[in-house]
Amino acid sequence: LMVTSAATAGVLKPLMSPAELANTMDQYEPIILDIRGDAYAEGHIVGANSAPYGLFRGPKINPGQLLDVKTLEQRFESLGLELDRPIVVVSEGANDSDFGAAARVYWTLKSSGFTDLTILNGGKQAWEAAGYPIGQINVKPQATELNITFTQKWTATTEQVVSVTKGEIDSLLLDARPASFYAGEKSHGAAARPGTLPGAKNYYYASFFVPGAAAISSAIDVASLKATLGIEDKQEIVSFCNTGHWAATNW
């Protein structure tokens, strides 16, 4: 469950096209995290570290669960991350759902104190399609030492969500899942029961994409979106789905 808020500015934009990233790599020398797992060995952006999506998620029985700070810190150190160095998150880019993986990693890093972050829009496939180099050398990052603090600023607790459903907190519950899940016609294995949270509105995460595309569209009318959902100025939004994957895209 993710609470929305404004992004902190860095040298990189939160979302970058392959061309934008290619034009800034020499200047900023970002750490590139390839979150695709085994596919990394088949080819990746030159210089990218392999950082499988599962490193940022909970156990198989509850992948949406947050990891404890010590575990996160150890994993970030093994990836050679530095708090003051730009980081690029790269998914496969095979479909719109892939973006949720990158967004979930982005959210986890941001909540852990990393401020200069970007997602490669369209992922590795968009990078390769644009003609930029792909390599197969396995990068072994040098471990770092970190002391992170995980902020709860963008996390909603169960107790807080219950208060929202009771009208005790003025926040908007936003269900990122397809309409069939929202209506209870389908159910994910991770869900306790079919349906949605009381009072929640539905905004399918794929609405941010042109049908069939893996990159988020730039033609998003924010004012119209706020009006459609009835979002008030400065109102907090609690984004949710089944495991924090699709919800991260809406966040």
Question: Where in the sequence are the language-model features?
Answer:
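Bacterial N-terminal signal peptides
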Residues: L1-S5
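Flexible, polar/low-complexity N-terminal or interdomain linker segments that lie immediately upstream
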Residues: A7-Y40, K124-A190, G195
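Extracellular/periplasmic catalytic domains that process cell-envelope and extracellular macromolecules
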Residues: T24-Q27, A41-I45, G80-L83, D98-A101, ...
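Structural recognition of the beta-strand scaffold that forms the well-ordered cores
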Residues: I31-D34, A48-P52, R85-S91, T118-I119, ...
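Helix-loop module immediately N-terminal to the HCX5R catalytic loop
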Residues: G58-P86, Y205-I237
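Thiolate-centered catalytic microenvironments shared by cysteine-dependent enzyme domains
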Residues: K70-Q160, V164, K186, G195, ...
